[in-house]
Structure formats: structure tokens, C-alpha cells
Swiss-Prot record:
GO terms for cellular component: cytosol. It comes from Pseudomonas fluorescens (strain Pf0-1). This is UPF0246 protein Pfl01_0961. InterPro entries: YaaA. PANTHER family: PEROXIDE STRESS RESISTANCE PROTEIN YAAA (PTHR30283:SF4), PEROXIDE STRESS RESPONSE PROTEIN YAAA (PTHR30283). It comes from the Bacteria. It holds the Pfam family H2O2_YaaD.
Length: 259
């Protein structure tokens, strides 16, 4: 089973990494093409393109300017440890053992607007470029057109390497839309995590993002390769709902979030 998750806007390049091992991103020639185009934009144009503040626009203009295809532990960090959003809080990769990193490297991928597809130990230089960014480019009107079927093809390779055709989608719609299903040789399993609010179970973004990370961690720590075993996920109060689930859409409910 191969999992895909979204990246995060928040990054952590201060905390020393939990492992010294690293790999090189596999698709940097594509990233470099985007970087060259982004370098032509002023900080103000970047702010407008990304709908962010002048401060964040300036920060990312500087990041694009200093980006280099020579990735080292001095100028980059393993992707799984560099991302710091809600999904990654649930994943808590900083506490992984080397065996956990081994399993994650084979069974987990991160979708990325700049890097396309990342393995956990791939070095990553800091950036912000969300997949939904409407950056017109030589390949089309946006990043979905830029990546085309490439991400699906790379996922097919990763699926073959790890031994089956099951893809567990733990990514957001924005990012999973970069996966062209017609080009994907996989059985896709989707998940929903719902919390009780005012007597109803609803998807609450903050909790759902963290739950995707918790599920990723659960699969990695338990080395789960049978989709049926995903129903055993019971971390932090979640439980499988047979009533609300379908064979390829697993729903988990929770009555109370931990204090």
C-alpha cells in the first residue's frame, strides 16, 4: 500500500533532523523549470499570484532566488521533517525510528507544487508554491497542466516498487487533483475523518488534517499492507463507521477530541 499526503505551508528548518540519512529529489529538472519562471516575478507579483502578504511574497522571492539544484544537508532538509503543518503534527516523524523511516520511504509520498512528488527522505529546499496556484507556464495555464500525467506515472512506479496497486489517498482535494486517475494503475482508497459537533458528525478541517497524519503514522508503525486492516485505526478516539463507509471510502468518527 502506498500513501499520498499534501505538503504544508509551514516549514521547520531549525529543529535538527531525527535522521542523518537523506535522498535526492527525483524530478529536479522539472522544479528548475518552474524556479526559472518564478525568478522572473517581482515580490509584488509573487504576492499577487499566491494571494499572500508582501512579507510572505518577499520571503518566497528570496527563496526562489537562492534555490540551487545542488541539494545538501546544509541548504536543505528531508521533506518529511521540513514540513510542519497539521498533517505533520499527526505524523510526528521527529519521533520515528530508523525502521519507521525505512518503511515510510517505500510507502509514503508527498505531493508538491514545486517538486511534483517527494519521498520522505528527499532533501527539500524551502519554498511555497501551492498546487492550485494559477501559474501560466509553457505546458499550460496552471500547475495541474505543468505536471500533467507525470505525477500519476511516478506513482505507478512507486506502487510497482512496493508490491501492490493500493493507493491510500490522505491528501487534500487541491493536491490529489494533480493525480490523473485515468493514468493511474491503482485501486484508490479515500478516507474521511469526522468529529461530532452540535450532535452531528462533520469534517472539521483542523482535526481532519491531523487525522490524515495520524493515519499515516498508524500505517507506518504497524506496517499495514492490507486495506482491511485500516478499519482498526482507533487513534485519539476515532473509530471506523461501517454504516457510513463504502469499500473504497473509509469513514472514521470521533465524539470528543483529546484535551
Amino acid at each position: 500500500m502506498l500513501m499520498v499526503i499534501s505538503p504544508a505551508k509551514t516549514l521547520d528548518y531549525e529543529t535538527p533532523p531525527a535522521t542523518q540519512r537523506f535522498t535526492q529529489p527525483q524530478y529536479l529538472d522539472h522544479s528548475q523549470e518552474l524556479i526559472q519562471q518564478l525568478r522572473e516575478l517581482s515580490p509584488a507579483q509573487i504576492s499577487e499570484l499566491m494571494h499572500v502578504s508582501d512579507k510572505i511574497g518577499g520571503l518566497n522571492a528570496a527563496r526562489f532566488g537562492s534555490w540551487t539544484p545542488a541539494f545538501t544537508p546544509e541548504n536543505a532538509k528531508q521533506a518529511l521533517l521540513a514540513f510542519k503543518g497539521d498533517v505533520y503534527t499527526g505524523l510526528d516523524a521527529q519521533s520515528f525510528s530508523e525502521a519507521n523511516f525505512d518503511y515510510a520511504q517505500k510507502h509514503l509520498r508527498m505531493l508538491s507544487g514545486l517538486y511534483g512528488l517527494l519521498r520522505p527522505l528527499d532533501l527539500m529546499q524551502p519554498y511555497r508554491l501551492e498546487m492550485g496556484t494559477k501559474l501560466a507556464n509553457a505546458r499550460g495555464k496552471d500547475l495541474y497542466a505543468f505536471w500533467g500525467t507525470r505525477i500519476s506515472e511516478w506513482l505507478n512506479e512507486a506502487l510497482a516498487d512496493q508490491g501492490d496497486d493500493v493507493l491510500l489517498n490522505l491528501a487534500s482535494n487541491e493536491y490529489f487533483s494533480a493525480v490523473k486517475r485515468t493514468a493511474l494503475n491503482a485501486r484508490i482508497i479515500n478516507t474521511e475523518f469526522k468529529d461530532q459537533k452540535n450532535g452531528q458528525y462533520k469534517i472539521i478541517s483542523f482535526y481532519a488534517k491531523k487525522a490524515r497524519g495520524l493515519m499515516s503514522r498508524f500505517v507506518i508503525q504497524e506496517k499495514i499492507n492490507d486495506p482491511a486492516l485500516l478499519k482498526q485505526f482507533d487513534v485519539q478516539g476515532y473509530r471506523y463507521s461501517a454504516e457510513q463507509s463504502k469499500p473504497d471510502n473509509l469513514v472514521f468518527l470521533r465524539d470528543h477530541a483529546p484535551e
